[in-house]
Amino acid sequence: MKIVVPVMPRSLEEAQEIDLSKFDSVDIIEWRADALPKDDIINVAPAIFEKFAGHEIIFTLRTTREGGNIVLSDAEYVELIQKINSIYNPDYIDFEYFSHKEVFQEMLEFPNLVLSYHNFQETPENIMEIFSELTALAPRVVKIAVMPKNEQDVLDVMNYTRGFKTINPDQVYATVSMSKIGRISRFAGDVTGSSWTFAYLDSSIAPGQITISEMKRVKALLDAD
């Protein structure tokens, strides 16, 4: 299970001031570019990709439709993704599939897609269908993050992850049940079949997230003989 840590600089200066030494134990960096105004993203990109050269990087534009900070039309969303991909070819590109389904055809040639679904209100009743539809598209990674209302919601996400991973062993999944009651899902990836877990360095960006140091301690405990 790899540890993913988001970075969200709000300016070029903040990007340049990131202390790289704090990320030594991080497996994957997620650049949450939605912390920036749309017109600043291309200008800040060189600082991010140069600073984290040697790390795997996810480029993410988390829109307000799925709990992020930026408002983009479908055309603007795809244009920014394509521009970043053509210049920097990041290891992974997050694509909010259900929020931008109309333009997904323009992404079919991308081998590095993380097809994602985020719901900060609930764990929808059709969660199995969401797993199924994303899996059928065979992206690099299927990512699902939903908000539980009770313990059963947490168990449903974990069980569906295990079930779909068993049937599709070559598909990478990154799933999480958010909030305090869902926190166990962040640690159980080796059992459920979720290959990524998300932690934070300075401030949490999702309910239930924990720090890198806390995640490392838990992983060490779980990995011990």
Swiss-Prot record:
<keyword id="KW-0704">Schiff base</keyword>
<comment type="similarity">
    <text>Belongs to the type-I 3-dehydroquinase family.</text>
</comment>
<feature type="binding site">
    <location>
        <begin position="30"/>
        <end position="32"/>
    </location>
    <ligand>
        <name>3-dehydroquinate</name>
    </ligand>
</feature>
<dbReference type="GO" id="GO:0009073">
    <property type="term" value="P:aromatic amino acid family biosynthetic process"/>
</dbReference>
<protein>
    <recommendedName>
        <fullName>3-dehydroquinate dehydratase</fullName>
        <ecNumber>4.2.1.10</ecNumber>
    </recommendedName>
</protein>
<comment type="subunit">
    <text>Homodimer.</text>
</comment>
<comment type="pathway">
    <text>Metabolic intermediate biosynthesis; chorismate biosynthesis; chorismate from D-erythrose 4-phosphate and phosphoenolpyruvate: step 3/7.</text>
</comment>
<feature type="binding site">
    <location>
        <position position="62"/>
    </location>
    <ligand>
        <name>3-dehydroquinate</name>
    </ligand>
</feature>
<feature type="active site" description="Proton donor/acceptor">
    <location>
        <position position="118"/>
    </location>
</feature>
<dbReference type="InterPro" id="IPR001381">
    <property type="entry name" value="DHquinase_I"/>
</dbReference>
<feature type="active site" description="Schiff-base intermediate with substrate">
    <location>
        <position position="143"/>
    </location>
</feature>
<feature type="binding site">
    <location>
        <position position="209"/>
    </location>
    <ligand>
        <name>3-dehydroquinate</name>
    </ligand>
</feature>
<dbReference type="Pfam" id="PF01487">
    <property type="entry name" value="DHquinase_I"/>
</dbReference>
<dbReference type="InterPro" id="IPR013785">
    <property type="entry name" value="Aldolase_TIM"/>
</dbReference>
<keyword id="KW-0028">Amino-acid biosynthesis</keyword>
<dbReference type="GO" id="GO:0009423">
    <property type="term" value="P:chorismate biosynthetic process"/>
</dbReference>
<dbReference type="GO" id="GO:0003855">
    <property type="term" value="F:3-dehydroquinate dehydratase activity"/>
</dbReference>
<dbReference type="GO" id="GO:0008652">
    <property type="term" value="P:amino acid biosynthetic process"/>
</dbReference>
<comment type="function">
    <text>Involved in the third step of the chorismate pathway, which leads to the biosynthesis of aromatic amino acids. Catalyzes the cis-dehydration of 3-dehydroquinate (DHQ) and introduces the first double bond of the aromatic ring to yield 3-dehydroshikimate.</text>
</comment>
<feature type="binding site">
    <location>
        <position position="186"/>
    </location>
    <ligand>
        <name>3-dehydroquinate</name>
    </ligand>
</feature>
<keyword id="KW-0456">Lyase</keyword>
<keyword id="KW-0057">Aromatic amino acid biosynthesis</keyword>
<dbReference type="GO" id="GO:0046279">
    <property type="term" value="P:3,4-dihydroxybenzoate biosynthetic process"/>
</dbReference>
<dbReference type="InterPro" id="IPR050146">
    <property type="entry name" value="Type-I_3-dehydroquinase"/>
</dbReference>
